[in-house]
């Protein structure tokens, strides 16, 4: 029964090969968590546009919100310390030095360069935590690669965020600072869940 059931395939990255879309006749819809992934699927895998729906990462809007926000002297980068984020982190080290801010890194260390960058007096490191909102709420601004969860969480807390677009090697393609959007509700957990439910209803009708 299972092999023949219609399916939805969700893709979470356009730069990690393990996230390449599965092409199978039982897959009736693809979900891309950002527009760039949709373009990647259309251009590199010839998946028709009408088969791809952009549904963003859901974020708990009760956990991440404007209340108790403040502004301390650090730029926050949340994410695994690995090859994919190395160039962005190095760029942020220089940026924060120029503007007189500290750079706080929060995430699992899965690289070989953390010890070296911590030699910079204005760089601090914290391990992964389930209470990342405590860091976001007090930050000056945040930064991350692609349009990821941390950027959305930051917007919900009223913080601007730098988005670094990188290639599969982590090299910077572009960077741009984004203010919180006016349509922030599209990232709310219940709204995202409803959109996914609607897509399943469509393919099962």
Regions found by a protein language model. Name each.
Residues 176-205:
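A charged, aromatic-enriched C-terminal amphipathic alpha-helix characteristic of glycosyltransferases
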Residues 1-17, 31:
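Active-site proximal beta-strand in glycosyltransferases
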Residues 108-112, 122-137, 148-149:
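Conserved active-site histidine-acidic residue motif and adjacent donor-binding/catalytic loop
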């Amino acid at each position: 029964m299972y092999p023949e059931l219609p399916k939805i395939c969700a893709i979470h990255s356009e730069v990690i090969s393990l996230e390449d879309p599965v092409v199978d006749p039982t897959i009736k819809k693809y979900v891309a968590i950002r527009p760039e992934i949709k373009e990647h699927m259309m251009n590199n895998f010839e998946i028709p546009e009408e088969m791809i729906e952009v549904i963003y990462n859901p974020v708990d809007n009760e956990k991440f919100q404007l209340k108790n926000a403040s502004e301390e002297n650090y730029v926050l980068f949340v994410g695994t310390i690995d090859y994919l984020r190395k160039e962005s982190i190095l760029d942020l080290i220089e940026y924060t030095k120029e503007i007189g801010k500290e750079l706080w890194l929060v995430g699992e260390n899965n690289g070989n360069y953390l010890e070296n960058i911590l030699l910079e007096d204005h760089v601090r490191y914290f391990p992964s935590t389930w209470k990342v909102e405590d860091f976001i709420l007090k930050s000056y601004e945040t930064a991350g690669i692609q349009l990821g969860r941390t950027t959305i969480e930051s917007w919900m807390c009223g913080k601007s965020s730098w988005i670094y677009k990188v290639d599969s090697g982590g090299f910077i393609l572009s960077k741009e600072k984004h203010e919180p959007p006016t349509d922030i509700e599209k990232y709310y957990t219940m709204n995202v869940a409803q959109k996914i439910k609607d897509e399943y209803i469509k393919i099962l009708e």
